[in-house]
């Protein structure tokens, strides 16, 4: 009986052990399965996130199907100014990407102070099937913002502004101040009166214009601490007659080099007619005033337009803003004229190397202003937000007329 009881007890123990072993094995198996599932899920999630990063925020559009709109404040055919430079960028993009002429829609002479005209031009682009619309003037900004909300499948890319929505509405501009600094060197070395003139579309309330004036003045000061920059403001982005009048007033005041931040080559034409010199803007204005233009501050807008349209084609458009510089090929100066002062090229080459190294930029460190105060911090770069939106001061050698 005892033996039977013992045998029975041994059998129960074995069964219990077997059951425990099975539970342990099942638990281990379940845990391993869960871990493998979690790992696979994490990997899939990472791959999905990577794919989303690469995909951008708008769907890809086949190259043969894409249509590009561009809104100009002027007519590119009428001169070498702002609209001409932007349109040359569109042409460069078209050639690089192999788009046909009927894939480009242009709207010309759209007054950036006429909201009805602006909206009509953009809506025409939408109705003609444009997938991305480049709005090239400051005053187009609010209409871009409005229509981007109404047409979420169309990209509105606005030049020179500050608004965006991170998806189908961005802004683009560049570090044109870098090229203006180099042009200032050329002007500062050429002047004999130590009076440089500067025709500006807008005044101290506009950081884009103020930054250009300051950079030009700082470049001139770096090679000629005795020179001053006299500024005449037209209060218009496009005013051919006003630009001529402003240039003439500066010449009458004794300025012997006329720089500009305005849309037409008229200041250079006025300089040539008066027998003085100049620095053009937007494109190489030596073709307009070959006896006056020492150099020109130039844009190569194709650097941005090609990148932007290509990103729409391959589906990587991410809605980010763009602020390119010399290292991106967006801004530079035209080749120096034969009558530039001796040593100018060497001085410009030295400054160019500093800028392109990335170790130094125009608005670094502490800067003295023309009201006796200072801006900036020793050993630090000025923030892009301050360059593009908070530059309401003038460098110490600037005189506003």
Named regions from a protein language model:
Residues 1-11:
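Sec-dependent N-terminal signal peptides of Gram-positive bacterial secreted proteins and lipoproteins
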Residues 8, 15-401:
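A residue-level marker of the well-folded mature domains of exported/periplasmic proteins
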